[in-house]
Amino acid sequence: DFQIIHLCGKGKLDTSLTDTEGYVQYEYIKDELSDLFALSDLVISRAGANAICEISALKKPNLLIPLSANASRGDQILNSRSFERLGYSKVLEEEEITNEKLLQTIRDLYKNREQYIEAMSKSSQMDSIGKIVGMLCDCAK
């Protein structure tokens, strides 16, 4: 059903998946990352500040899987829950993931992707640059 591009991290490639149809893995992507985001129908990601800012700026339907409180400061949990509350994201805690639950969540997200795009489009934060420029222009008068 899906074509998957998996960014695994340095030293975490799984060679047993090399010939899997519809699946490509990379340790890291730098210059092409914005192109991959632009081409994606949906994004599955951790919930770090940079990731969620990129996802929301591009209005990509997304599934956030935050690092657990044991593996982080807890900021990713807060980020993901905030985005979920605003209707921007679907969230699964790492501890609750099963193959079936992950696949069903992805299918639901894809089916309802327009509602996530619409929620992100309505965000008052989407025109932050315009607001800042407006404030600067007002101050310059």
Describe each region flagged by the PLM.
Residues 24, 39, 82, 101-108, ...:
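Alpha-helical elements of Rossmann-like donor-binding domains used by nucleotide-donor carbohydrate transfer enzymes
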Residues 86-93, 97-114:
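C-terminal "capping" alpha-helix adjacent to the active site of nucleotide-linked donor transferases
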Residues 111, 125-141:
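C-terminal alpha-helical cap of glycosyltransferases
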